């Protein structure tokens, strides 16, 4: 895998399952579990594009941690949430993984790999955060941003009204 250092972001977005939310909030960090990094997107626009190429592609094959061949299950929006996070530490543990492709690949594949690589960044270690907003997945997939800070009322914005 080709890792390159990435600039330190001021905020990131993380897709997770709703049933993990309480543990995440109690810990105050996103844990990497069996992987080297935990993965994030730098904008909601990138998150949507990432999801369209991955979790929203039911049955599509991918390689999981350790090189195991897996297939995306049916995505259940009501069981997922996007977290908007402000990282606590400003250290440079951020990396981008550049999608590997065979030598002499067609230009279309090279371009697709480069575009996919720009959609996500990884953080080496468990990411501690200080602020969190929750973005409703079902609304997000309809093109709306329903966002709630902890202990604040929901705010709704249409995606075309936001600067992503």
Stretch-by-stretch model annotation:
Residues 1-39, 52-55:
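ADP-ribose/NAD+-binding catalytic cleft of ART/PARP-like enzymes
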Residues 58-164:
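Active-site and NAD+-binding cores of ADP-ribose-processing enzymes
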Residues 23, 48-50, 93-94:
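Short helix/loop capping segments that flank catalytic or ligand/cofactor-binding pockets
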Residues 18, 44-47, 88-91:
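Short, charged/polar surface micro-motifs in flexible loops or helix N-caps
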Residues 44-61:
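Short active-site loop/helix that positions an aromatic residue
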Residues 36-42, 112-115:
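A generic structural motif
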